[in-house]
Amino acid sequence: MPDFSGTTATTEIHVSETKPTNNGRYKIVGNHLLREFSNEEILKDIAKRIADGRRLIIPIGLPQSGKSMFIASLIAYAFRRDNKEDNSCNFAVPGDRNASGVETILNALDKNDVLPSTRPDEMTITDLDMESRYRRKRIKITLLDFSGEDVERLTGKRTDDDQHSAEKIKQILAACIAQRAIFAVLTPVDEQIQEVGQASDFDITEDTEMHSFITGLRTSAPRLYNMTKFLLIITKWDKLPKRVSPEKYLQLHRNTLYSEYSGYSRSYGLIPYSVGDVVGNTIIKMVLRSPRNFWYTLYRWCTGKHVLPWWKRIFS
């Protein structure tokens, strides 16, 4: 269980002393090794984003949770969807698109290549701006991604000697959580599932580790826990042999996560997620319905408004 106690004092000072830049010119963008920068440098850069009004979105998932493809699908929806079919919102990358890593993702998707997973000790920071065509409110977000192996170190599942990156991530997350962060908690359907309702060892491990992460926040840093939101994302949803509601699946296969979701409903959301057809390292077809639902949910959480006006939702 991660312990975040005693990690907030330094980070709050950085945030309060930082002036907005409003130009997207941050020192740390794209993919980097955590060891490249000191805690001070990383926290200052995050503080600049917070001062600029950016909402911090942190995907959390174990290895093989589909986190890299989840992020790729979000970028695909933002910049590769058919605007004739869906022109509900616009996206932009502040600063240098090449440095941000967005172009690298788009180039891979154009070749139908699956993106490689984030490696241990890596950190990827991607800034995006989103606005609805029907609203004046724009949201500015920062996607902050760490490897599944480092998430395992946070939850205590991985107990090797290399805990340096995990300790650094704890400091980073403490700063993020204090500024209304949103955790996208990815938990995949077991690809070997035979029958809905029979929890496998895979299900139990996923349930235990993701619940450990969340309860670690609540018990060791309750004030930080109360300032964040959790969006539970059931990835690889297309692998289910039988259709059930996301709530029912969570209850049957992630029971402790379901207890969190149902007991603290004001802090939680839940969506099923599928990126489409992937065979090996090749994307056969990417489906953009799931990323659209994610972006719509995110916009509503950040603004209190739906991307679409009521009349558009009725007739679309």
Question: What are the roles of these predicted feature ranges?
Answer:
Residues 120-130, 136-179, 192-194:
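Switch II of P-loop NTPase G domains
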Residues 62, 111-116, 129, 254-261:
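Intrinsically disordered, low-complexity boundary segments flanking structured domains
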Residues 37-119, 135-141, 149:
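Conserved G1/Walker A P-loop phosphate-binding module
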Residues 54-56, 125, 138, 227-229, ...:
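Extracellular structured ligand-interaction cores
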Residues 171-175, 181-316:
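Conserved GTP-binding G-domain of TRAFAC-class P-loop NTPases and closely related GTPase folds
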Residues 91-94, 146, 187, 274:
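A short hydrophobic beta-strand->loop->alpha-helix junction that borders the nucleotide-binding pocket
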Residues 1-60, 64, 215, 219-220:
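Short, flexible boundary segments at extreme N-termini or domain junctions of P-loop NTPases and their
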Residues 63-64, 71-75, 141-144, 177-188, ...:
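Short, hydrophobic, well-ordered secondary-structure elements
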